[in-house]
Regions:
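Conserved catalytic/acceptor-binding region of the Class I
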Residues: 144-211
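Class I SAM-dependent methyltransferase SAM/SAH-binding core
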Residues: 46, 52-104
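Class I SAM-dependent methyltransferase Rossmann-like catalytic core
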Residues: 4-26
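Conserved alpha-helix/loop element of class I SAM-dependent methyltransferases that forms part
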Residues: 24-44, 58
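A short acidic, Gly/Pro-enriched loop at the edge of an enzyme's catalytic core
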Residues: 104-113
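A short glycine-rich, Lys/Arg-flanked "PGG" loop and its adjoining helix->strand segment in the class I
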Residues: 127-142
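A short SAM/SAH-binding and catalytic strip from SAM-dependent methyltransferases
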Residues: 112-127
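C-terminal helical/coil "lid" or tail adjacent to the Rossmann-like core of SAM-dependent
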Residues: 8, 14-15, 199-257
Length: 270
C-alpha cells in the first residue's frame, strides 16, 4: 500500500467484502441523507474514501445522466473493485480515482456535493479531510458526513469479554491517532471548516438476532487482532478466551446489541 495509507481497518480481502456488504446495509440511511440535502439532477458530486462501492450508485442515480460523480480511494485493490462494480452495473456517470483523502488533487470549488461515510472514524487527522472536502465544493455547495460514535455500542446483559476487548481496541486506536467517538464532533468540524447552516441527524439501531451487523464489533477486533497483540494490549490466550465468550453471547437471542451512535451532519459553503 501507499506509504501514507493510515486507514485503521486495513485493506484485506475480508475488509473489502465487509465494506461491500456495508454499502447495502447503509444504503437506505445514505439515501435519506441525500434526499434531505436535495442533490439535483445534473449535479457534480465527489465521494471521499468510497472503498469498493460506497455510495457511488446512490449518487449516480441522483445526479442522473447529465451529472457526474467522482470516487476517491487510496487502496488500489478497492479502486479496482469499485471500477468492476460500476462496469457490472453499467454505470457511466461515475469515475473512481486513486488518491489521498486529505490531498485529492481534484480541482477546487468544482463540486456541488462532497461526502464521506465512515471514513473519519478510521483516519488520523480527520480535520485535514474535512478541510479538503470544503475546498472541493463551490459556493453554495454542501459537505455531508456520516460518522460513528462508539459510545452507544454495548450489549445487554453486559459481558466482561466485550468490555475487555473494547478497552484493548480503544487503547490501540488512541495510540494510532484514531478517534472512535468522532461522530459527536463532526458538526463542529464542519463549522470550523467554514461551513454554515449545519444540520445534524442521529441514527441508532438494535441489532437483532440474524441482523447482518450484529457481529460488527467481533469483526473489528478480529480484523485488528494481530496488531492489538503486537502492542501487548492483551495476551493471545486472553484474546482467544474473550472472542469465544463474545461469540457465545452474541449467539443467544436474548442478548441485546445496540449499534454505534451514527451521526449524519451536513453544511453549506457560503
Amino acid at each position: 500500500m501507499a506509504h501514507d495509507d493510515q486507514y485503521f481497518l486495513g485493506h484485506s480481502s475480508v475488509e473489502q467484502r465487509r465494506l461491500q456488504q456495508q454499502a447495502g446495509e447503509l444504503a437506505e440511511e445514505s439515501a435519506r441523507l441525500f434526499d434531505q440535502i436535495g442533490l439535483a439532477q445534473g449535479s457534480r458530486a465527489v465521494e471521499i474514501g468510497c472503498g469498493p462501492q460506497g455510495c457511488l450508485e446512490l449518487l449516480s442515480s441522483r445526479v442522473g445522466p447529465t451529472g457526474s460523480v467522482v470516487g476517491v480511494e487510496l487502496s488500489d485493490h478497492a479502486v479496482q473493485l469499485a471500477r468492476e462494480f460500476l462496469s457490472e452495473r453499467r454505470i457511466k456517470n461515475v469515475e473512481v480515482r486513486q488518491g489521498n483523502a486529505a490531498a485529492t488533487g481534484l480541482p477546487r470549488e468544482r463540486f456541488d456535493l462532497a461526502t464521506a461515510r465512515l471514513v473519519l472514524v478510521n483516519i488520523p487527522e480527520p480535520e485535514k479531510i474535512v478541510a479538503e472536502m470544503a475546498s472541493l465544493v463551490r459556493s453554495g455547495g454542501v459537505v455531508a458526513l456520516h460518522e460513528a460514535d462508539w459510545s452507544a455500542h454495548v450489549c445487554d446483559p453486559p459481558l466482561p469479554a466485550w468490555d475487555r476487548l473494547k478497552v484493548a481496541l480503544v487503547t490501540y486506536s488512541e495510540q494510532k491517532g484514531i478517534d472512535l467517538y468522532i461522530g459527536r464532533r463532526i458538526a463542529r468540524m464542519l463549522r470550523n471548516a467554514g461551513l454554515v447552516d449545519v444540520q445534524v441527524h442521529p441514527l441508532i439501531h438494535i441489532y437483532a438476532p440474524n441482523h447482518s451487523r450484529r457481529p460488527i464489533f467481533l469483526q473489528f477486533v478480529n480484523n485488528l487482532r494481530d496488531r492489538i497483540l503486537a502492542e501487548g494490549l492483551i495476551s493471545e490466550a486472553e484474546f482467544a478466551e474473550c472472542i469465544a465468550s463474545l461469540e457465545g453471547h452474541l449467539a443467544k437471542p436474548e442478548t441485546l446489541v445496540i449499534s454505534h451512535l451514527f451521526i449524519q451532519a451536513w453544511g453549506r459553503k457560503p
